[in-house]
């Protein structure tokens, strides 16, 4: 018990805090992400997922709803889009980041939009 208290006191003294959340996402970033998500040239997420406001969605992937509940950690969502094979080697989802289908900036915008759903 003594060591636990010492450890807690040391962590508090060093200023350990929770990870920062990307709360500074602009409306323009979300709109750019939506454009990429719905566009057929880059993201084309509608080909496989049901998304609010989307027309003619596919159904081979899960619907993109309640994303903050499904991915409380935004980085986990980003990792999933970057390369879904890391969590499921048999996935049919393309590795958008690993295969450079999306640039790093485009990936951030897509994550901004999807995380807003």
Task: Please identify what each model-predicted range represents.
Residues 1-4:
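Positively charged n-region of N-terminal signal peptides that target proteins for export
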Residues 6-14:
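Bacterial N-terminal signal peptides
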Residues 19-40:
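Electrostatic cytochrome c docking/interface patches
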Residues 32-36, 72, 76, 105-109:
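Extracytoplasmic/secreted proteins, especially bacterial periplasmic and envelope-associated proteins
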Residues 38, 46-82:
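Gly/Gly-Pro-rich "capping" loops immediately C-terminal to redox-active cysteine motifs
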Residues 43:
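Cys/His-enriched microdomains
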Residues 58-67, 82-109:
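Axial heme c-ligation environment in periplasmic c-type cytochrome domains
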């Amino acid at each position: 018990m003594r060591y636990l208290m010492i450890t807690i006191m040391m962590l508090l003294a060093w200023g350990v805090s929770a990870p920062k959340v990307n709360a500074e996402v602009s409306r323009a970033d979300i709109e750019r992400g939506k454009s990429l998500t719905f566009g057929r040239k880059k993201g084309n997420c509608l080909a496989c997922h049901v998304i609010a406001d989307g027309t003619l969605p596919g159904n081979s992937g899960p619907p993109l709803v309640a994303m903050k509940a499904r991915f409380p950690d935004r980085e986990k969502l980003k990792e999933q889009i970057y390369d879904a094979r890391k969590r499921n080697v048999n996935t049919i989802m393309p590795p958008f980041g690993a295969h450079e289908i999306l640039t790093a900036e485009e990936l951030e915008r897509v994550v901004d939009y999807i995380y807003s759903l």
